[in-house]
Amino acid sequence: MIKNSFSAIFFKEENEDNKGSVEFQVVSFTNRIRKLTSHLELHKKDYLSQRGLRKILGKRQRLLAYLSKKNRVRYKELIGQLEIRETKKN
C-alpha cells in the first residue's frame, strides 16, 4: 500500500502552524477517507473500518457545512481542489 499517494498539494506552501484551520482538517479527513476506501475495496467485510469511515465522513460533512456558512468562496475553492461533491442542502 502506498502511504503518501494522497498528499495534499494545497497545503504544501503553508506553514504547519495552521493545522487547526477548517481547510487543513477537511484535507486530512479526505486523505483518510481515500485510504480507507481503497482498504475497503480489498477487505469488504471489515465492518469496523466501515464504521470508522462513516464517522470520518460525518465529521468532514459537518466541517464543510460550517465552512459553507462562514465563507462560501473558500468552500467552493476547497471542494474544487479536492474534487469532492458539494453537500446537499436540506
Swiss-Prot record:
What Gene Ontology cellular-component terms does the record carry?
chloroplast; ribonucleoprotein complex; ribosome
Location relative to the cell:
Plastid, Chloroplast
The protein's matches in CDD domains, at most eight in alphabetical order, are given as:
Ribosomal_S15p_S13e
**From the UniProt record, which GO molecular function terms apply?**
structural constituent of ribosome
Q: How does it assemble?
A: Part of the 30S ribosomal subunit.
Matching NCBIfam families, A to Z?
S15_bact
Which protein are we looking at? Small ribosomal subunit protein uS15c
> Whose protein is this, by species?
Daucus carota
